[in-house]
Amino acid sequence: MKYGVYSIIDRAAEEFGPIYQSSNDAVARRRFDMLLSDLNVAFPDDFKLFKLGEFDNSTGILTGFDKPEEVYFPKDDEIQNLRIREVK
């Protein structure tokens, strides 16, 4: 099965974080949303989710894209909604 390979960029630091795999963009976004809902994340609007490539777990082949693809950059109101759900 092919999995997407993702990373979150910190726009203030101008660097990508650790990579992780997810079965699709929706699952990767859910994981990203969980991170942003954490009230300990001080500047959630500094982060964007990118897809870097694909990993085929049956062949072990990792294929990177020529350029990272932006998957999700939440708006301020979306971040607020995530954080409100976390507090409840």
Give the residues covered by each predicted segment.
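Short aromatic-glycine-(Arg/Gly/Cys) micro-motifs in beta-strand/loop hairpins
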Residues: 1-16
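Conserved short hydrophobic patches within well-ordered secondary structure
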Residues: 7-8, 21, 48-50
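Short, intrinsically disordered low-complexity segments
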Residues: 10, 30, 82-84
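Eukaryotic short linear interaction motifs
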Residues: 15-16, 29, 58-59
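A short, exposed loop/beta-hairpin motif centered on an aromatic-Gly-Thr core
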Residues: 15-24
